[in-house]
Amino acid sequence: EILIGLVGSEMCIRDSTAAVFVSFDKKPTKEQMLEAWANFRGPAQELDLPSAPKQFLHYFEENDRPQPKLDRNTEHGMAVCIGRLREDTLFDYKFACMSHNTLRGAAGGAVLLAELLAAKGYFD
């Protein structure tokens, strides 16, 4: 079981940011979380869809990242950028993440969904 808390905001600069708080039944190490993010491959990556980012989740080690202005176009705007992973006093961990509103969240997300449905045979 995983417990997740989330505080999100949409920025006037075309991006969504979230502060994520997460707890697990068995707390992983920080290194295990970073490894899971680095190795994550969803259906879009497994099927090598045209609009899919090669690396869906990007973790930034810098303490001031992710930043919408600097990171919104990671993987042509189709990645989720993560940073500031640290232990929390109430939850196991907290971290920040952001994505491009239009490219990942709306238009690009819709195109990627259509590619996935086509690859899975829903239009046959």
Walk through the language-model features, giving the residues of each:
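Metallocofactor- and cofactor-centric catalytic cores in central/energy metabolism, strongly enriched
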Residues: L3, M33, P68
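Residues that form or flank phosphate/diphosphate-binding pockets in enzymes
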Residues: E1, P28, G105
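Acidic Ser/Thr/Pro-rich low-complexity disordered segments
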Residues: L49-P50
